[in-house]
Amino acid sequence: MFETIAGIVVVGGVLLSFMAYQRSQIAPGEVNPIAADDPDMAKARSTAQETLSEFRDLFASYPQTSLVKLPVTSSTGTLEWMIGDVVELTDTYVKVQFRGRPVTHRGAFQSLQTFALRDIADWQAATSNGKYRGGYTQRVTFARMRAAGTLVGAAADEASKYD
């Protein structure tokens, strides 16, 4: 009886390990569905850069709710746009703590990183009244969802928080 149970546990463990390995080998789906030369997103990124002084002021008041979007190249060479919590903001750099890791990344990933301010693609700060400032690329996404008639539910609630 014991040998049967032990055999089932061993076979189950081997099967789970094999399934996990197979899943890790599957190529991830498209991680950047927005083209690099998308004019609306380029304008949003430009606006974010032009308004960094506003972000500095907001960060001073709301450091716990300040985020930035940055381009990160994964170990596979894929460019992914990632959101990070701002840990430190100076006149020349931003230090961020990423909440996750790039989808296409393999191996260790340093979640605390420093970037030049010019690398910031977007910024966002939640104010004390629950409204968001910045978030220019997200606004483009919400506008597109609204135009397509797909801005509903939680996404619509989130979109309503932008000043």
Where are these regions (language model features)?
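Mixed-charge, low-complexity intrinsically disordered regions
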Residues: F2-D163
